[in-house]
């Protein structure tokens, strides 16, 4: 069973994964199993083009930023499992015992 399953790898999902990943050495987060369903197709950034964002080169595509964010996550926090090529179809259960069904598998998580 996962302790936390993050659904979606848009800006909010990846930010959540980065924050939880960075806490791996904290007493409250040690030995926690964290995963992210790395589906990004619904993110509004998919079609964005950045021209005036601080620190981002002009003409940078949002889809590139999303892809790079997952690469960054896997590089610095490899303990955060990235579930790729799957889309969530349903969620059932209650706090502490959720069942998340994707197009390929079913996952159990305490928190989603």
Q: PLM features: residue spans?
A:
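Beta1-alpha1 glycine-rich phosphate/pyrophosphate-binding loop at the start
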Residues: 2-67, 72, 79
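A conserved short coil-to-beta-strand element within the FAD-binding core of flavoproteins
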Residues: 84-97
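Short hydrophobic core segments
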Residues: 5-7, 106-112
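Glycine-centered tight beta-turn/hairpin loop motif at sheet-sheet or coil-to-beta transitions
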Residues: 101-105
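Flexible, charged surface loops at secondary-structure boundaries
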Residues: 28-29, 93-94, 106-108
């Amino acid at each position: 069973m996962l302790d936390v399953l993050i659904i979606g790898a848009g800006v909010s999902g990846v930010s959540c994964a980065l924050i939880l990943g960075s806490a791996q050495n904290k007493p409250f987060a040690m030995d926690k199993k964290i995963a992210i369903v790395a589906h990004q197709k619904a993110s509004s950034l998919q079609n964005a083009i950045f021209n005036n964002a601080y620190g981002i080169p002009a003409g940078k595509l949002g889809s590139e930023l999303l892809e790079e964010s997952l690469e960054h996550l896997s590089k610095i926090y490899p303990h955060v499992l990235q579930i790729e090529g799957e889309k969530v179809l349903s969620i059932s259960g209650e706090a502490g015992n959720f069942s998340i069904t994707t197009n390929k598998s079913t996952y159990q998580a305490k928190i989603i």
